[in-house]
Amino acid sequence: MAATTAPNPLAAYRFLLRATRIAFQGDFTTLHAARAEARKQFDQHRQQGVDTPMRIQHAMETAEILRTNVVQGVKISGDGEEADRYASILVMRRFRGEYEGEDERREKEREARGGCELRIHEHIERGDNDSIKTAGKNERVKVAVGKACSNTQ
């Protein structure tokens, strides 16, 4: 029998730090706060416990969300210059990618009225909403009364 290896806390911590670097690149304040929180959580639970694998799994999932779903935004003033950074935006898992490939006219209009510019990096999960639109339209399977669920008609 092959022995299962326990999740490595150090690897999870490093993965989380890398994810914060990717998600909060260019925003030192948020990057520092996220890393301080990660350090605090790992220091509080330094001793091995029954829930250690669960906490490591939580750290890995948090890192994955930071890498794939958090986008930094920069507020653009009316004259096209950066005004100030604002809080990160948690985007939907099926991000449409509509900020890529906009025509110049729409881009100029958005800058003229003051908008925001998103730093969308290569790790951001993109998709279309087609799967969401068709989610409730699956054919329903009819099960005969009195038969096991595996027997369908």
From Swiss-Prot:
Entry's localization field: Mitochondrion matrix
GO CC annotation terms, alphabetical: mitochondrial matrix
Disulfide bond residue pairs: none
Keyword Nucleus attached: no
Keywords for the protein's UniProt record, in alphabetical order: Chaperone, Mitochondrion, Transit peptide
One term of GO molecular function: protein folding chaperone
Main localization (coarse): mitochondrion
Transit peptide as recorded in UniProt: 1-56
UniProt GO BP: mitochondrial respiratory chain complex III assembly
Domain of life: Eukaryota
Entry function: Assembly factor required for Rieske Fe-S protein RIP1 incorporation into the cytochrome b-c1 (CIII) complex. Functions as a chaperone, binding to this subunit within the mitochondrial matrix and stabilizing it prior to its translocation and insertion into the late CIII dimeric intermediate within the mitochondrial inner membrane. Modulates the mitochondrial matrix zinc pool.
Subunit organization: Interacts with RIP1.
Family listed: Belongs to the complex I LYR family. MZM1 subfamily.
UniProt name for this protein: Mitochondrial zinc maintenance protein 1, mitochondrial
Lineage of the species this protein comes from: Eukaryota, Fungi, Dikarya, Ascomycota, Pezizomycotina
